[in-house]
Amino acid sequence: FNTLNSISTLVLLKQSETANAMLTRLSSFLRHTLVTQPGGKVTVAQEMETLQLYLGIEQMRFEERLRSDFRVEPDAAKAQLPAMLLQPLVENAIKYGVSPQEEGAEIAIVAQVVGPRLRVTVSDTGPGMTMNNIEAGLPAVRPTHARRDSTGVGLANIRDRLAQAYGEEHRFEIRSPESGGFSVLIELPFETEESAALSEATAEPAQAAPPKKPSAPSAVVTSTLPPKAHQTT
């Protein structure tokens, strides 16, 4: 909605070229997101492409106030994660990190492979938020004026998606030092498209096999012959 409002304002100001450029980027972003199946997974590379399209739109609104830094390891780029998992985090970073500050903020997205796991961190250099304590799952937080309750709702939704997809095999942490800034760390089991397809292929035969009919009990023959006598010469 913010993007549409910005386009409307540009049209009213007769800045048609800028409005057309923003509309084109918005169209590309929406097309990119609509081809993804709901609840499906994408590679980290695809998720980063989506984020770059989204940030390209926001860049036209905030200009030099919005700075981004993508750091993705080659192996991490192949890993899979739930589609559109990171976009709400970037949106929060813009709304509560970039927007409130005159100088804006930098948003960093880092993806790396740590042992058998994928680790993704989304952070910003905004005003941050205070935290009461950190629990095993979603930390209990007390938003400041800069980060209202909507942030907690967005984070809770992401946590719930991770719990549904990975159970206890995921890690979700919020960090906000007193000096400012805000970051969310996510860890998932490392999985590529190939390994996921292989897992599905090995699971399908067992699921597709029809239940076996109970066979008739086999007859049990008990020998009643006496033991064979030893021959004597």
Regions found by a protein language model. Give the residues of each.
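Two-component histidine phosphotransfer core
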Residues: 1-175, 182-185
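C-terminal end segment of the histidine kinase catalytic
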Residues: 176-233
